[in-house]
């Protein structure tokens, strides 16, 4: 996503040129930017598109929609929605196939750096965490109602946090004190609560990192949206069309990798009995995607933008 080290510094789009180089294989196609953010990728796509090209961008964040309103280009359109609803949006516009889809996953620095959004454990703010602040329940609302086992499951599965059970117990214990202390609805209090529950520290990582990631993913249904969005993106790609996905943690990258490999190497994902049977060449499942590689940020980019360090970009082409 677009990153910004602190208020007032210019936005830095991760793998900006690499992503667009991989995505744009013809300049007159219809392209999708599934996560507009602050528009870093979209603006570069528009710079490189020919007069016959089109770009449709998606974002759930109202702030991103406001930013998209500053793009004055007849070839551009923005959808205030998740890229998971790609099919419906394209159908409404009478569009069948597209030349490429870019998904830049995760959270942007402007979202993290604004305490009022509730994503940051370093700044106090309401425990919100919604990408789309116009709908859905907040992290505070979910924590106030969820079963202790569900809280532990979310923190374990989406945060890969080994102290998930202890953190869930601490949250539920604090919830019992709501009558005298008020609800658990501030990021600073949750961060302090997690720090007390986590028994060991990882070097260079705040103890609340994994819990905040897990709650954000759950509140926004990020992994479910990713799985749905990948399927829709593939189905909409024309022959030769490109799918470019930038992920920032192992849960996202694992989903992307498995999805692409299943379509590029269908014989490996076939049923065990089919893999064991001797098949003629024409009986083998045909690949539907061609893997074009994996890219990491350069040392120079990581030095200039440390938050890009974990980024992995995977590229595939429809056969």
Curated annotation (Swiss-Prot):
Domain of life: Bacteria
Predominant cellular place of this UniProt entry's protein: cytoplasm
GO terms for cellular component: cytoplasm
Catalyses which reaction(s): cytidine(1402) in 16S rRNA + S-adenosyl-L-methionine = N(4)-methylcytidine(1402) in 16S rRNA + S-adenosyl-L-homocysteine + H(+)
GO biological process: rRNA base methylation
EC number of the protein: 2.1.1.199
Keyword rRNA processing found: yes
Cell compartment(s), UniProt: Cytoplasm
Entry binding sites for S-adenosyl-L-methionine: 39-41, 59, 83, 104, 111
GO MF, any single term: rRNA (cytosine-N4-)-methyltransferase activity
Keywords: Cytoplasm, Methyltransferase, rRNA processing, S-adenosyl-L-methionine, Transferase
Similarity remark: Belongs to the methyltransferase superfamily. RsmH family.
HAMAP family referenced in this protein's UniProt entry, alphabetically: 16SrRNA_methyltr_H
Described purpose of this protein according to its UniProt entry: Specifically methylates the N4 position of cytidine in position 1402 (C1402) of 16S rRNA.
Protein name as annotated: Ribosomal RNA small subunit methyltransferase H
Gene that produces this protein: rsmH
